[in-house]
Each structure stands twice: as C-alpha cells, then as structure tokens.
A protein has these predicted regions:
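Short, charged alpha-helical interaction segments and adjacent helix-coil junctions
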Residues: 1, 75, 81-158
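Accessory alpha/beta interaction modules
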Residues: 1-67, 77
Length: 158
C-alpha cells in the first residue's frame, strides 16, 4: 500500500502544479518525503531514495523529476550525515533535551509555539481527520531545483 500512496501523492502534487495549457516541461521536480518510525523495506537503512527507472536498461537515465525519500528514524545502515541522524532522533523524541544543535533548537521552539497556538492545533487536527489516520508522520516537500531534500534550518542534502 505504501508505494501506491507515494504514487497518489506525486499525482496529486503534479496535477496541482500544471495549469491548463502549460507544457509538461514546466512541471517542477517534486520530492515526497516520508519520515517513519518503522522500516518500510526491512533493510535497516536510515535513507531510502526511490526514483523511476527503465527495467530493461537500468543504467538508462530517466529523469521524470519525481523522487521519493523514506527516512527511517531508527535505521543504522548506510552513511547518512550526522545532522540528519540528529534530526530524525529529534523527530521521534521531540524534547528540548534532544534538540542538540542550533537548528534543532530553532525547530523545537517552532514546534512548541505551534502546540501552544490553539488555532494551529485545531487546523492540524482537522487536516488529519480529512486525510485519515496514518501510522507514519508524512511530509510532502516540493523542491524546485536539483535532487535535494531539505532538513531543519534549510540544510540541503543530496
């Protein structure tokens, strides 16, 4: 079900970003990011980057501008940057004690402010009600240029 959810999110984003009469070349690159506390593929990787490819010729470049990144908060395989490890640890255990960098401290202040603001909390609950209940916290982030995803504080990773 997860790959089909990804497909749905990409389609929904693309449909909203291509005005009638525009060429397909004007579609922006889109990265859908899932941050999960469970391993979506069972390989214990912190980062799984998914892109479309040609099955018969895997080395063929197929740049459709769509990319999906799964971030598993407890993964240990691969070589993710230390800042990403700290961010994912904070995402799962969001407390002031786990805000170990300046960027995470800024993020924690924003999270605290949002939690205190009743209107924002109500809007969040209504959006969750409309979307349904998911096991994983999901974030969709549009990226205009390149193949990057953005972590707290605007730090870009390849």
């Amino acid at each position: 079900a997860l790959p089909r959810r990804v497909r749905f999110y990409h389609a929904k984003i693309d449909a909203g970003n291509l005005p009638s009469g525009e060429t397909y070349g004007s579609l922006r690159n889109v990265v859908v990011i899932f941050i999960t506390t469970y391993d979506p593929f069972g390989l214990n990787r912190m980062v799984y980057t998914i892109k479309n490819c040609c099955v018969e010729v895997p080395e063929l470049k197929y740049e459709d501008g769509a990319q999906t990144i799964f971030l598993y908060t407890r993964g240990s395989e691969g070589n993710p940057p230390e800042e990403l490890k700290q961010l994912l640890h904070y995402m799962e255990h969001s407390s002031v004690e786990n805000a170990s960098t300046e960027n995470l401290k800024k993020l924690h202040r924003m999270v605290t402010a949002v939690k205190r603001d009743g209107e924002v909390g109500l809007a969040y609950m209504n959006s969750r009600k409309n979307e349904g209940s998911y096991k994983a916290w999901t974030q969709i982030r549009k990226v205009r240029e390149g193949n990057y995803f953005i972590a707290a504080g605007g730090t870009a990773y390849r």
